[in-house]
Each structure stands twice: as C-alpha cells, then as structure tokens.
C-alpha cells in the first residue's frame, strides 16, 4: 500500500508528508476493522535506503517516525522499516499490511512474491472497489494470453463481503 502512486521517483520525496502518511495509516486501519473485522498489524517503510537519512534528506526521522509514534496508542503500527528487508518472509509474516512510500517500493516486491495471486483494493472510497492487481496491458489484448488468477481472487474477495 503506497503513500504516493504513479509518480516519477524524483518527485516522491516532495509528496511524502506527515498528513498523507497519517491519513493512509488511519484509512488502512479503518478498512481492516470494517471489512475484515480485525485490528491489523501495520508496518511502514522508510523512504531512504536502510532508513538512513543524511543531514540534508531526513524524511525518515523528521516525517515518518513522528507520525508512527503519534498513532501507536490507537493503531497497531510500527516502523519505519527498511524497504529492502521488510518483505522478507520472516519479517512480512509479522504484519497484515505494509505501507510504503511509493509505488514500486511496495508493488515490485508484492508482484515478485505473489505474481498474479494478488488483488488491488482501493480504500478510502465510500464503497468497496476491488480490481485485479495489474495495470492495463494493451499488448495482450485479443491474444488469449492473460492470466485470470487476479480477477478470480478479486471476485472471491468481493463474494466474502
């Protein structure tokens, strides 16, 4: 679950704000409680490699950490964690959801681990929106080569709600 979506990497750090991080954590928590009926264990990645900040770029300490600290009494949230290790099996099994700072920080590992067996849930809307976890692949249109697993998982998820 990324804080920012489809942005060039050079623009990401300017879009990482305390407000956006807090909103995303709260929305994810509310979604789990409403639709899945339990309090999720949420991990948040840092922005910089290994969550190390140099003096000029200090997003992990100045922006991300204070938000997590402010929510810890209300929401089961921890971090920031290095994005290169949070998706390792022993780390990710400790959490129900991992919130990252940008699209590829989260989606690249998810698609590598789960391939087509993942779904996209758009949260924060007044209705439930679920789609297959892949973008439109126009090169596959009409060739009968697409994999339907993600569509099937999306329908199964909706059927349980």
Protein language model regions, located:
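Glycine-rich phosphate/diphosphate-binding loop of Rossmann-like nucleotide-binding domains
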Residues: 2-80
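Short, glycine-/small-residue-rich phosphate/pyrophosphate-handling segment
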Residues: 1-26, 137-161
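Glycine-rich phosphate/nucleotide-binding loop
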Residues: 67-161
